[in-house]
Every structure is written in structure tokens, then in C-alpha cells.
Amino acid sequence: MSPVDFLQDSSQLSYESIQVPHDWMITDTLDLYKNSVGFYKKDFILQNTADSHVAIRFEGVYMNCAVWVNNKLAGEWKYGYSTFEFDISSLVHDGTNSILVIAVYQNPNTRWYSGAGIFRDVNLIQKQKMIQIPEKEIRYAGKCIKHRRKKSCRVK
């Protein structure tokens, strides 16, 4: 099952306030290993987006997830224990933006309790756009020096 398969369900749900990191599976300890889906929504405000690089970084989401920003797919991640980041610069605008994360837990996948959902921190990163200078426009000067019978180069 892909998180994208559950996108239509997200608009018909009632959401409760939670704190991230969050493990939705631990709330039902009678059935810890059932296949399930978690939906996370958040609104946030940005300014100066035209001059910014904006990314969202997840330290961990278990198990398979997809992320939408302003109803557009930002990306999918299939590896539950690793950190990942999506460039969302083209998806955000000045003012209120929304994010939706759908995470799918499928059993069996591990020999121990793995949890489910956004189990680590999430960071929204906004920084000034970088300007890339083509290599042919970069000039440098260097001189080689001897130091303890080894050669090294110093670039000025």
C-alpha cells in the first residue's frame, strides 16, 4: 500500500491535536501490529518565499510516507528509520501554507516494536537562495610550499 492511495481519505477525517514526535500505534496496545495509516496536518506561515530556499526535513517517519504541501505532492519516502528532506520552494507562498503527511504501517516488517508515525523531529528550513557561480568564472592563484619533506599547496 502506498500513502498516495489514502489521499482522498484525508479530507473526510477529523483531526486531533498531538505533539510531534508521535507514535499512533502505541495508543491501541491491544493490537500493536495491525496494518494502519496515520494522517498528520499542519498549517504554517511563511514570508519572503520568493527570495528563499525552503525545505522540510524529517528526522524519522515510520514506515512509508508521502508529503503534500498546499495539495501538491512534495515527495515520498519508503525507509522508515532514515532522515530525509524535500525541497518545497516551488510549493510554498507568502502567507498560510499547509502540509499533509500520510504514513502507512505494514506488518510484518520487524522483529521488535517499531512504532508508527512521525517518531522524530520535523524541521522547516528557510534560507536565502544561493547563487551558483559557473566554474569558468572562478579565478584562483596558488603556490606550493615544502613542509617537512611533504608537498602541500596553498590557495590564495
Where in this protein do the model-derived segments appear?
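Accessory carbohydrate-binding/adhesion or oligomerization-edge regions at the termini
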Residues: M1-I26, I45, I102-Y105, L124
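Surface beta-strand/loop "capping" patches
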Residues: K129-K156
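Short, intrinsically disordered, low-complexity segments enriched in Ser/Thr and Pro
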Residues: Y15-H22, T29, K146-K156
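Accessory beta-strand-rich segments of carbohydrate-active enzymes
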Residues: L30-D31, N35-P134, A141
